[in-house]
Amino acid sequence: MECPYCQNTSSRVLESRSTEAGQSIRRRRECLQCKHRFTTYERIEFVPISVLKKDKSKESFDRSKLLRGIVRACEKTEVSAQQIENVVEEIEARLQQSPRREITSQEIGQLVLQYLRELNEVAYIRFASVYGEFKGITDFVETLNQLQQEERESSSSPEWSDAGEEATVIEDSSQVMASS
């Protein structure tokens, strides 16, 4: 590794640690000639993944695009930046581990929804509203009702059933309009 200060190629590694969920290695080095210390990163070079979009065009997988979409969905929620980064890393790792080098944007969207559903319901609905291309309030209400139904089925908390405070499922969009 070439020293960024004196360009000498001899250095010694002082410390190494895994970063980015094991996807890279951070090394702290010291130049043997000028004694300056510097940090280097070793990253795995992945085979590029192509994303097949709805309009049948292809583009290279763009991690920053995935991150932006998830950040936008998680705005003003309790989801931390670290949690968002973890989701992006996990999705990217799953894509890289797949033997397929071409994936549809719909498949990526489904992966994001799986993670957001566990992380935060508001972020899930926000992402679903863009990804699912809701045509109107009816689509939105149907997704909310589905979430609510699944939550009821998975909830076995005695406090919930004893409290009698079960939320009302909205049956049609006219009720939403009237209550607004």
Curated annotation (Swiss-Prot):
GO molecular function per UniProt: ATP binding; DNA binding; zinc ion binding
The keyword Nucleotide-binding is assigned to this record: yes
Coiled coil: none
Any GO BP annotation: negative regulation of DNA-templated transcription
Record keywords, A-Z: ATP-binding, DNA-binding, Metal-binding, Nucleotide-binding, Repressor, Transcription, Transcription regulation, Zinc, Zinc-finger
Residue spans of biased composition, Polar residues class: 171-180
Cofactor: Zn(2+)
UniProt-annotated stretches for the region Disordered: 148-180
Domain of life: Bacteria
NCBIfam families referenced in this protein's UniProt entry, alphabetically: transcriptional regulator NrdR
UniProt family annotation: Belongs to the NrdR family.
Protein name: Transcriptional repressor NrdR
Lineage, uppermost ranks: Bacteria, Bacillati, Cyanobacteriota, Cyanophyceae, Oscillatoriophycideae
